[in-house]
Amino acid sequence: MVASARGLRTLHSAHSSISALPASTVPRLQLAVSRCYATTTSPDCPITNSSNSSNSTPTLTPKQRITAFKDKLNAGPSFSDFVSGGGASNDSVPLDPTEAYSLKTALVGPPGKKKQIIRLPSWLKTPIPDSPNFRRIKSDLRGLNLHTVCEEARCPNISDCWGGSSKSAATATIMLMGDTCTRGCRFCSVKTSRTPPPLDPHEPENTAEALSRWGLGYVVMTSVDRDDLADGGARHVAETVRKVKQKAPNILLECLTGDYAGDLEMVALVATSGLDVFAHNVETVEALTPFVRDRRATFQQSLRVLKAAKEAKPELITKTSIMLGLGETEAQLWETLKALRAVDVDVVTFGQYMRPTKRHMAVHEYVRPDVFDSWKERALEMGFLYCASGPLVRSSYKAGEAFIENVLKKRRGEGADGSGGSSTRREDVERLVAGGVVR
């Protein structure tokens, strides 16, 4: 009590002393009476000193800056503006060809450092994957520790291939030997390393289990390049093919392989392992190959691989794919198709190159859909059994698989519906391509 009384007397004395001072010497203190977190400053919200609030930008607290940033995001374009069917435009209204094929540009980047980029054309926009089949396939892949090129290569068709309305309509391309490649092609987003993880000895069995579980009629398997292995992984691929055929003997199997460093014996080993379609991509024309693919991959080596596969098993369907939009010329494409026909390649596909990330080579041009249609007609006229050609077509795109499945079933002596029928000669297959009737 005595201490409290002394404290009160001290405070009273200090107050009396300050009150006796002249007004000019008494310090003036401005106290903030409230806290505001709005993104706009109110006149009665003293965030800053009133002496300079009229001629300077208010200083925002960290929480206010976060709120302001969120408001800007909310006021900007929504996610639907970046996928097909989104935004305020009506996709059902037909466009004039000039307007439909015109490429629009946009400025992106921070103030003072904005760059002009070409926006993705409308014909290259795809929906976001979200379907029961998509979730089921993804769950099975994770449970069995398997990888797909659909995910690793960021394929734009993943929602279409994985999201089929039924098991027979859904397709996934299994990627063997891990998710890390020893090569670094300038167009590919698959991870790369000189020393990738060792092969999974359980992968052949797990792959066979997954494919038999899905109940698909046509399956594509691809693989990374493994130059760190003596055989390039050819024996691992061949074993996987045999395991799949044991668990699902009626399944039609396509393998998209590497070049095995030019070892044609390994190519023959895979070609005769029991698969139905041997695919190896030349990717681009010969003149652009050194700038597009890894230095260990050459155009002539790819031709030798395709030729060796056909020689090892003449009834095998061979297939390759070419990307457009890299700067190739019409004359170069003609020469490429001639070279492919010279080694008896049966199927060719054309697709638009789409830059996966800023670290990869830039797109030279977005090729119009009518140009893809033109190249399809030319390829069929040259004698290819089938040609899938379009901006979103990829080497394992299921539109091509449906036709190849029909051809293979007829060669086996089945009808297109599996009911049975006479075997198909090459002339019958060509008649199928032309839309005729096979007798």
Swiss-Prot record:
Cofactor descriptive note: Binds 2 [4Fe-4S] clusters per subunit. One cluster is coordinated with 3 cysteines and an exchangeable S-adenosyl-L-methionine.
Record-linked SMART domains: Elp3
Interval spanned by the transit peptide: 1-37
InterPro entries associated with the record: Aldolase_TIM, Elp3/MiaA/NifB-like_rSAM, LIAS_N, Lipoyl_synth, rSAM
Major place of residence: mitochondrion
Chain positions recorded as [4Fe-4S] cluster 2 binding sites: C181, C185, C188
Domain Radical SAM core: 164-385
Protein's UniProt keywords contain Transit peptide: yes
A Gene Ontology molecular function term of the record: 4 iron, 4 sulfur cluster binding
Binding site for [4Fe-4S] cluster 1: C150, C155, C161, S396
Keyword tags: 4Fe-4S, Iron, Iron-sulfur, Metal-binding, Mitochondrion, S-adenosyl-L-methionine, Transferase, Transit peptide
Alphabetical list of CDD domains matching this protein: Radical_SAM (cd01335)
Pathway given in the UniProt record: Protein modification; protein lipoylation via endogenous pathway; protein N(6)-(lipoyl)lysine from octanoyl-[acyl-carrier-protein]: step 2/2
Catalytic reactions on record: [[Fe-S] cluster scaffold protein carrying a second [4Fe-4S](2+) cluster] + N(6)-octanoyl-L-lysyl-[protein] + 2 oxidized [2Fe-2S]-[ferredoxin] + 2 S-adenosyl-L-methionine + 4 H(+) = [[Fe-S] cluster scaffold protein] + N(6)-[(R)-dihydrolipoyl]-L-lysyl-[protein] + 4 Fe(3+) + 2 hydrogen sulfide + 2 5'-deoxyadenosine + 2 L-methionine + 2 reduced [2Fe-2S]-[ferredoxin]
Compartments in which it is found: Mitochondrion
Pfam families cross-referenced by the UniProt entry: LIAS_N, Radical_SAM
Co-factor requirement: [4Fe-4S] cluster
SUPFAM superfamilies: Radical SAM enzymes
Top-level taxonomic group: Eukaryota
Enzyme Commission number(s) of this protein: 2.8.1.8
GO cellular component: mitochondrion
NCBIfam families: lipA, PRK05481.1, PRK12928.1
Protein family (similarity comment): Belongs to the radical SAM superfamily. Lipoyl synthase family.
Protein known as: Lipoyl synthase, mitochondrial
Organism of provenance: Paracoccidioides lutzii (strain ATCC MYA-826 / Pb01)
